[in-house]
């Protein structure tokens, strides 16, 4: 399966790794294809620079060491495919849809009430309960 991570999950995995998060990441790396979008990677770098100054180099090194498929979020995004409370989250799900991602893992509650077939939207806890 192709699994995309949202920014908040990436931050947790890269800056605050724990036993469960490491297990989830290892499972994804060994059994599935990790997909990261340009929007999420850019947002990750921006958040780290703003909230965790001095960690940018570490994040860049970790990203370079990770195995993932990098997909581009289009600069022009078709609106109206789904409703989401926070418009800043629209490009994340839009990219997951157009790139045919199977699962989007996010800790963002704004995704929880979206009713779409694919990708399946799961929290890290839901993902771990199902697959680990």
Name the predicted role of every residue range.
Residues 68-104, 109:
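Active-site neighborhoods of divalent-metal-dependent phosphate/nucleic-acid chemistry enzymes
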Residues 33, 69-70, 120:
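Conserved beta-strand segments of alpha/beta enzyme cores
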Residues 1-2:
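Residues that mark the start of a beta-strand
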Residues 82, 109-132:
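Acidic, PIN/NYN-like endoribonuclease modules and their adjacent C-terminal/linker elements
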Residues 6-7, 37, 107-108, 123-124:
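A secondary-structure boundary/capping signal
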Residues 5, 15, 21-49:
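PIN/NYN-family metal-dependent endoribonuclease catalytic core
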Residues 38, 42-66, 126, 130-132:
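Extended, non-globular alpha-helical segments
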Residues 9-10, 40, 92, 110-111, ...:
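Alpha-helix capping/helix-boundary segments
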């Amino acid at each position: 399966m192709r699994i995309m991570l949202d920014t908040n999950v990436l931050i947790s995995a890269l800056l605050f790794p724990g036993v469960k998060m490491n297990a989830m990441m290892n499972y994804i790396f060994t059994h599935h294809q990790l997909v990261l979008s340009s929007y999420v990677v850019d947002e990750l770098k921006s958040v780290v620079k703003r909230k965790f100054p001095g960690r940018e180099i570490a994040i860049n090194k970790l990203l370079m060491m990770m195995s993932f498929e990098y997909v581009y979020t289009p600069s022009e995004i078709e609106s109206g495919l789904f409703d989401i409370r926070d418009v800043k989250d629209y490009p994340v799900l839009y990219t997951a849809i157009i790139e045919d991602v199977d699962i989007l893992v996010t800790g963002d509650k704004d995704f929880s009430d979206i009713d779409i077939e694919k990708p399946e939207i799961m929290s890290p806890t839901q993902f771990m309960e199902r697959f680990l």
